[in-house]
Amino acid sequence: MLMITSFANPRVAQAFVDYMATQGVILTIQQHNQSDIWLADESQAERVRVELARFIENPGDPRYLAASWQSGQTNSGLRYRRFPFLATLRERAGPVTWIVMLACVLVYIAMSLIGDQTVMVWLAWPFDPVLKFEVWRYFTHIFMHFSLMHILFNLLWWWYLGGAVEKRLGSGKLIVITVISALLSGYVQQKFSGPWFGGLSGVVYALMGYVWLRGERDPQSGIYLQRGLIIFALLWIVAGWFDWFGMSMANGAHIAGLIVGLAMAFVDTLNARKRT
């Protein structure tokens, strides 16, 4: 199987698939963050790419609009649900993605009800030498958030990036990225600011770095991040470093997380190339 391209609009993807069916080429659509087009017979790849270039130039051409009828498919296979937003949330996130989101929400509720300090005493990075053997503390800091905007921003990125990694590469890969980046970004951040910090952003930056570089070096992995978004991430690090917006940011965790993600993607793509 070879991934040809992705479309943000599922109906556009279906139009191209239907047209290629009339040309004797069978493509399939897999719905993830976008509608991914896959080709089973890789010997037809060059032909498909030529037709794709023509399609992108003029997707409204009548031959494409009529393709569903010619291929005998009057039903695109799309299903419209009463709550499409909730359906999208479910479809684009695996169990690990959901478990982490739920943990963050529950911890945020607890912090709102009984106070930040009470929760941090149990979940923060070890703040006393006698706590260094409480191993969970090296990871549970990622569940603590200190404002509604803080948790919403992090969970949105976690769902978008973590969900894509889990759906494409499996729950194990997401767990490995999360555990390593939580540990290393937390270690760096406590060197910067001490143990009283929290948030999922170090892991989010690791996912940004991983998804972007993995997509650039290994397009067949099926994950990618637009270059504009990685530029935004870098600008956000700069803004936090120079305190442009007067907000307290975990700059050490952000930088460490990004480096961890890039390093892991580099290693994984090296291994992928050795196998091919």
Swiss-Prot record:
Active-site residues from the entry: S201, H254
Gene Ontology CC entries for this record: plasma membrane
Gene Ontology biological process: proteolysis
TM helices/strands, residue ranges: 94-114, 142-162, 169-189, 192-212, 229-249, 250-270
Catalytic reaction equation(s): Cleaves type-1 transmembrane domains using a catalytic dyad composed of serine and histidine that are contributed by different transmembrane domains
Membrane topology: Multi-pass membrane protein
InterPro entries, alphabetized: GlpG_N_sf (IPR038236), Peptidase_S54_GlpG_N (IPR022732), Peptidase_S54_rhomboid_dom (IPR022764), Rhomboid-like_sf (IPR035952), Rhomboid_protease_GlpG (IPR023662)
Subcellular location: Cell inner membrane
Record EC number: 3.4.21.105
Top-level taxonomic group: Bacteria
Keywords associated with the record: Cell inner membrane, Cell membrane, Hydrolase, Membrane, Protease, Serine protease, Transmembrane, Transmembrane helix
Protein's job: Rhomboid-type serine protease that catalyzes intramembrane proteolysis.
Family affiliation: Belongs to the peptidase S54 family.
PANTHER family linked: RHOMBOID PROTEASE GLPG, RHOMBOID-RELATED PROTEIN
Protein name (database record): Rhomboid protease GlpG
Organism: Salmonella schwarzengrund (strain CVM19633)
